[in-house]
């Protein structure tokens, strides 16, 4: 039975060094988030087959690989978001706002995809643990049972000898079952380690969202401060123009008064000379 390709959810490695600019990181993160969501949907589909007739070692192997590769994709996206936060901001305040909004939207999408993935991870872990519990409970012979029955065995009849051989066959089957149980327990430990990784990613994401909010507040404060400075400069220019106009008016009055005084003096001198 085919369970779908696993490589489609892995981020294809670049053939060479890629430019780490804002837009390329945004694009890579968006693609990763989409793949995480797609992988989560397929994990749910595989999980629904656990404990049914479709359950098999191949299904569990695919489920484990898909879950682990998705976890690695989430860790890669987390590192890219950290790198995104370390890029220098553009000079334009409007471009700064636009980039902040893009990052905020991206982190919200990542948080949502990550939350859905972790919910499915926990459900897979619960199902695997239930499966192991059923397998242990259904084991035909425990080690203590075999030891006790071997002590009670008597070879007085051919029939009892056949019964002992049958028990040994059952014990061999049980050993095989126990080996499968050990494999599942190993897979569960890996799954729980991946769940802890996702928990750490959530902590990092919460910190980045907090820093993002502080940065947006800082940008808005700078924009408001610039607007205040512009308003103050405009007010000062208006005042300067007012004072300059007032000064010119005073100058005109002074010139007019001086003109009148000079005229009066000229008239007085002219009259006196006669």
From Swiss-Prot:
<keyword id="KW-0812">Transmembrane</keyword>
<feature type="modified residue" description="N-acetylserine">
    <location>
        <position position="2"/>
    </location>
</feature>
<dbReference type="Pfam" id="PF05739">
    <property type="entry name" value="SNARE"/>
</dbReference>
<dbReference type="GO" id="GO:0031901">
    <property type="term" value="C:early endosome membrane"/>
</dbReference>
<feature type="modified residue" description="Phosphoserine">
    <location>
        <position position="142"/>
    </location>
</feature>
<keyword id="KW-1133">Transmembrane helix</keyword>
<feature type="coiled-coil region">
    <location>
        <begin position="33"/>
        <end position="130"/>
    </location>
</feature>
<keyword id="KW-0007">Acetylation</keyword>
<dbReference type="GO" id="GO:0032456">
    <property type="term" value="P:endocytic recycling"/>
</dbReference>
<dbReference type="InterPro" id="IPR045242">
    <property type="entry name" value="Syntaxin"/>
</dbReference>
<keyword id="KW-0813">Transport</keyword>
<dbReference type="GO" id="GO:0005484">
    <property type="term" value="F:SNAP receptor activity"/>
</dbReference>
<feature type="modified residue" description="Phosphoserine">
    <location>
        <position position="218"/>
    </location>
</feature>
<feature type="topological domain" description="Cytoplasmic">
    <location>
        <begin position="2"/>
        <end position="250"/>
    </location>
</feature>
<dbReference type="GO" id="GO:0031083">
    <property type="term" value="C:BLOC-1 complex"/>
</dbReference>
<dbReference type="GO" id="GO:0031201">
    <property type="term" value="C:SNARE complex"/>
</dbReference>
<feature type="modified residue" description="Phosphoserine">
    <location>
        <position position="139"/>
    </location>
</feature>
<dbReference type="GO" id="GO:0055038">
    <property type="term" value="C:recycling endosome membrane"/>
</dbReference>
<dbReference type="GO" id="GO:0000139">
    <property type="term" value="C:Golgi membrane"/>
</dbReference>
<feature type="region of interest" description="Disordered">
    <location>
        <begin position="1"/>
        <end position="20"/>
    </location>
</feature>
<dbReference type="InterPro" id="IPR006011">
    <property type="entry name" value="Syntaxin_N"/>
</dbReference>
<dbReference type="GO" id="GO:0050821">
    <property type="term" value="P:protein stabilization"/>
</dbReference>
<keyword id="KW-0472">Membrane</keyword>
<dbReference type="InterPro" id="IPR006012">
    <property type="entry name" value="Syntaxin/epimorphin_CS"/>
</dbReference>
<dbReference type="InterPro" id="IPR000727">
    <property type="entry name" value="T_SNARE_dom"/>
</dbReference>
<dbReference type="GO" id="GO:0006886">
    <property type="term" value="P:intracellular protein transport"/>
</dbReference>
<keyword id="KW-0597">Phosphoprotein</keyword>
<dbReference type="Pfam" id="PF14523">
    <property type="entry name" value="Syntaxin_2"/>
</dbReference>
<comment type="similarity">
    <text>Belongs to the syntaxin family.</text>
</comment>
<feature type="domain" description="t-SNARE coiled-coil homology">
    <location>
        <begin position="178"/>
        <end position="240"/>
    </location>
</feature>
<keyword id="KW-0967">Endosome</keyword>
<dbReference type="InterPro" id="IPR010989">
    <property type="entry name" value="SNARE"/>
</dbReference>
<comment type="subunit">
    <text>Associates with the BLOC-1 complex. Interacts with BLOC1S6. Interacts with NAPA and SNAP23. Identified in a complex containing STX6, STX12, VAMP4 and VTI1A. Interacts with GRIPAP1. Forms a complex with GRIP1, GRIA2 and NSG1; controls the intracellular fate of AMPAR and the endosomal sorting of the GRIA2 subunit toward recycling and membrane targeting. Interacts with NSG1. Interacts with TPC1. Interacts (via N-terminus) with VPS13B.</text>
</comment>
<dbReference type="GO" id="GO:0000045">
    <property type="term" value="P:autophagosome assembly"/>
</dbReference>
<keyword id="KW-0175">Coiled coil</keyword>
<dbReference type="GO" id="GO:0000407">
    <property type="term" value="C:phagophore assembly site"/>
</dbReference>
<comment type="function">
    <text>SNARE promoting fusion of transport vesicles with target membranes. Together with SNARE STX6, promotes movement of vesicles from endosomes to the cell membrane, and may therefore function in the endocytic recycling pathway. Through complex formation with GRIP1, GRIA2 and NSG1 controls the intracellular fate of AMPAR and the endosomal sorting of the GRIA2 subunit toward recycling and membrane targeting.</text>
</comment>
<dbReference type="GO" id="GO:0005654">
    <property type="term" value="C:nucleoplasm"/>
</dbReference>
<protein>
    <recommendedName>
        <fullName>Syntaxin-12</fullName>
    </recommendedName>
</protein>
<feature type="topological domain" description="Vesicular">
    <location>
        <begin position="272"/>
        <end position="274"/>
    </location>
</feature>
<dbReference type="GO" id="GO:0055037">
    <property type="term" value="C:recycling endosome"/>
</dbReference>
<dbReference type="GO" id="GO:0045121">
    <property type="term" value="C:membrane raft"/>
</dbReference>
């Amino acid at each position: 039975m085919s369970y779908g390709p696993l490589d489609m959810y892995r981020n294809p490695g670049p053939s060479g060094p890629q430019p780490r600019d804002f837009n390329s990181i945004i694009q890579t993160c968006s693609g990763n988030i989409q793949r995480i969501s797609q992988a989560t949907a397929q994990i749910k589909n595989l999980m629904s087959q656990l404990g049914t007739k479709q359950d098999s070692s191949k299904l569990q192997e695919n489920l484990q690989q898909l879950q682990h590769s998705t976890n690695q994709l989430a860790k890669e996206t987390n590192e890219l978001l950290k790198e995104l936060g370390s890029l220098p901001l553009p000079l334009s305040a409007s471009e700064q706002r636009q980039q902040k909004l893009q990052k905020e939207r991206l982190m919200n999408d990542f948080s949502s995809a990550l939350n859905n993935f972790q919910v499915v991870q926990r459900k897979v872990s619960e199902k695997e643990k239930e499966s192991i519990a059923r397998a242990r409970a259904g084991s035909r012979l425990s080690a203590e049972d075999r030891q006790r029955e071997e002590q009670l065995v008597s070879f007085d009849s051919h029939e009892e000898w056949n019964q002992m051989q049958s028990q040994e066959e059952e014990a061999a089957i049980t050993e095989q079952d126990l080996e499968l149980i050990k494999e599942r327990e190993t897979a569960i430990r890996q799954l729980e380690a991946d769940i802890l990784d996702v928990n750490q990613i959530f902590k990092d994401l919460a910190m980045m969202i907090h820093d993002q909010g502080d940065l947006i507040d800082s940008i808005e404060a700078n924009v408001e401060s610039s607007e205040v400075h512009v308003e103050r400069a405009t007010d000062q220019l208006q005042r300067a123009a007012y004072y300059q106009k007032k000064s010119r008016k005073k100058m005109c009055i002074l010139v007019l008064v001086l003109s009148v005084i000079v005229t009066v003096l000229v008239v007085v001198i002219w009259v006196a000379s006669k």
